[in-house]
């Protein structure tokens, strides 16, 4: 039995009279279409936004029971870049998920992903459906809409479960891998193949499932469950645990120089990490900076300004 499921059963026992159970996500969907407003009826994207919100929040994505207070907070931001042909759009997708930290009012970012290869077909009254046994559907461009979203939902679930139980997200990463292996194929559809750029869906799920990068799951569990979740009871020990997790992340980076998952896991973490280590001793800060100089070069100068 997973930790998440155990917690939910406890909640059921204590609050059964007031607790309402439902699906896994509390997702928001925002579609920005100003670049094509003079080409497309605004009703199209208003309806699509509503349908996608229902698709994400009303479908069951796992076998576990979630209470309202256990739902995963996440957001999907779609920017329509251009109209490729009638009802076919090129877009950028931003996916963000968060997780509460135990015994606090703090919410920590888990996934912060930008996907620039989001092409799909949609027209008014089109059903928004996904069948994991027939990912390609009957029209690849229509299917790519929900296949891409389903893929990221499984990534969100996998990371969330990993953060509560060591390697707890394996089943969901395998579901994401199944989407990749059976992804829609058509002209204009990109992001599913290993050669579709340096950052794509194939590479991300490959990083999360191949044996050579298994330590990344130890990092996720250690950082969140053994680190952040324990800070209210033993701050110093938890801070050391988080530093060790980041050092293990460096080991993963050193062994897999082109990894995609390390920078994604660190995306949006600057404020959190610098806050945790702001009053650490000089030796700990020195070790942290040395580690970040390998795994988060993009933000290294900001860390140095804050911590040195």
Regions found by a protein language model. Name each.
Residues 1-25:
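Bacterial Sec-dependent N-terminal signal peptides
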Residues 23-90, 101-103:
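Start-of-domain marker
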Residues 30, 213, 217-308:
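A cross-kingdom marker for long, charged
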Residues 35-42, 135-143, 254-255:
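Second-shell loop/turn segments in exported
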Residues 53-61, 154, 158-162, 274, ...:
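Sec-exported extracytoplasmic/periplasmic mature domains
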Residues 87-203:
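Acidic/His-rich structured neighborhood in mature extracellular/periplasmic domains
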Residues 157, 164-258:
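Flexible, glycine-rich surface segments
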């Amino acid at each position: 039995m997973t930790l998440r499921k155990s917690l939910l059963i406890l909640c059921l026992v204590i609050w059964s009279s007031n607790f309402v159970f439902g699906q896994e996500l509390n997702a928001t969907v925002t579609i920005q279409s100003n670049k094509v407003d003079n080409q497309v009826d605004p009703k199209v994207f208003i309806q699509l936004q509503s349908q996608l919100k229902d698709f994400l929040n009303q479908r069951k994505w796992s076998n576990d029971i979630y209470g309202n207070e256990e739902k995963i907070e996440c957001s999907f931001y779609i920017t329509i870049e251009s109209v490729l042909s009638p009802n076919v759009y090129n877009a950028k997708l931003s996916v963000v998920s968060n997780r509460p930290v135990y015994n606090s009012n703090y919410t920590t970012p888990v996934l912060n992903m930008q996907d620039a290869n989001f092409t799909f077909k949609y027209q008014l009254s089109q059903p928004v459906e996904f069948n994991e046994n027939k990912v390609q559907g009957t029209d690849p461009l229509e299917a790519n809409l929900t296949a891409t979203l389903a893929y990221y939902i499984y990534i969100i679930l996998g990371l969330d479960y990993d953060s509560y139980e060591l390697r707890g997200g394996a089943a969901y990463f395998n579901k994401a891998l199944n989407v990749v292996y059976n992804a829609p194929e058509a002209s204009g559809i990109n992001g599913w193949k290993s050669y579709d750029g340096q950052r794509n869906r194939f590479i991300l799920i490959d990083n999360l499932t191949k044996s050579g990068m298994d330590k990344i799951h130890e990092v996720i569990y250690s950082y969140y469950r053994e680190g952040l979740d324990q800070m209210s009871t033993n701050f110093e020990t938890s801070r050391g645990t988080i530093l060790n997790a980041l050092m293990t992340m460096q080991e993963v980076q050193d062994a897999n120089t082109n990894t995609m998952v390390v920078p994604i896991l660190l995306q949006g973490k600057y404020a959190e990490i610098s806050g945790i280590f702001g009053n650490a001793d000089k030796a700990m800060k020195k070790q942290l900076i040395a580690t970040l100089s390998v795994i988060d070069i993009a933000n290294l100068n900001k860390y140095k300004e804050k911590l040195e």
